[in-house]
């Protein structure tokens, strides 16, 4: 009964993923559908990509839906970068496609064509910007509704698969540019690591990400158990007992509490959790303002966290 919505751009990674899913569909009982997003950015090249994907899907007899967006216009309207706007519209496209499938949410999977080097690039990018454990294991083979069927494959293996199966694909010219940070990591930094440090750097980083993911999952579970003791009046009241927990559990619990109250994760950072922890050492009556209309205040017995 499951439906797999495959995000296909027409590039080498997504074409290998689509071919693998098409082959698996013969053995496993699921419905395969393709989602292609036209971002309205690259003019005739984007039109070419759309036609290519539509033609392949007709040839392989896979239903395909194209969603068109004016990303430059939306980027100006939303006051966001085009990269962030692109992520938002792609997420919306999958949501729109899922809505017309007539299935329960639990029966729908979204397949993304991230590969082993993508994972390594993301780790490096997040590490250089500053991150916690979560930012070092953001790409997982299966993560809720998201699946990444080719995360275990290197770009060399993907190239071999394309050649062996005689699968055509297209090249996105923006991937060749060094304008974006991720492309500079891809073209220069990761190859240098593999040439001058370890030839299997990307593979080893993928293995490390898997171990970090296990640690992240355990810490999240433990902090969730701790957090449940301090829920009160549509917020949280952290007494002395909370502040005797290991500090990493305190941080993870505060992270979950604030995400729950805010209803989102974006713009919540380590500095906010640290401020709440510091508040416990301050005098009664002190308070701090937090994103999304949240507030933490110190009273006689602890720290209260709630929405204003």
Predicted regions and their residues:
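Conserved phosphate/pyrophosphate-binding and hydrolysis machinery centered on Walker-type P-loop NTPases
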Residues: 113, 117, 174-183, 201-205, ...
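Core alpha/beta nucleotide-donor-binding catalytic domains of modification enzymes
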Residues: 1-188
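Inter-helical turn/loop segments and adjacent helix faces that build the functional surface
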Residues: 192-204
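AMP-forming adenylation/ATP pyrophosphatase catalytic core
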Residues: 1-13, 31-37, 69, 89, ...
